Amino acid sequence: MAGGKAGKDSGKAKAKAVSRSQRAGLQFPVGRIHRHLKTRTTSHGRVGATAAVYSAAILEYLTAEVLELAGNASKDLKVKRITPRHLQLAIRGDEELDSLIKATIAGGGAIPHIHKSLIGKKGQQKTA
């Protein structure tokens, strides 16, 4: 084998690449989140390797939580498609998510709420 690279890679099969998302057992893209964290920091792109994994895990958990609650809301209304209205009902119905997500949801509508002092007691007659 003239001019060959016989010593290098002699009979070993190259291992298949495993993504960081697969290693962490996540669905969200750890590599992409790491890239976005690097471009949006002021410390010259220095971001720890576990920061992206942790951020991806948090985003995945919050997304799963919101989608589960919105799915329950759509099931209660007997429809199969989640709409912005279902997302709005799910987020505003959960106290912790409501405090976390203060954004206005386009197409979400208004949350029905009647103050307790306006609701009459049972058997109480309205006087005219």
Swiss-Prot record:
Keywords: Acetylation, Chromosome, DNA-binding, Nucleosome core, Nucleus, Ubl conjugation. Monoubiquitination of Lys-122 gives a specific tag for epigenetic transcriptional repression. Acetylated on Lys-5, Lys-8 and Lys-12 during interphase. Acetylation disappears at mitosis. One of its GO terms (molecular function) is structural constituent of chromatin. The modification N6-acetyllysine is found at K5, K8, K12. The modification N6-lactoyllysine is found at K12, K14, K116. Belongs to the histone H2A family. The nucleosome is a histone octamer containing two molecules each of H2A, H2B, H3 and H4 assembled in one H3-H4 heterotetramer and two H2A-H2B heterodimers. The octamer wraps approximately 147 bp of DNA. H2A or its variant H2AZ2 forms a heterodimer with H2B. This is Histone H2A.V. It comes from Oryctolagus cuniculus. The gene is H2AZ2.
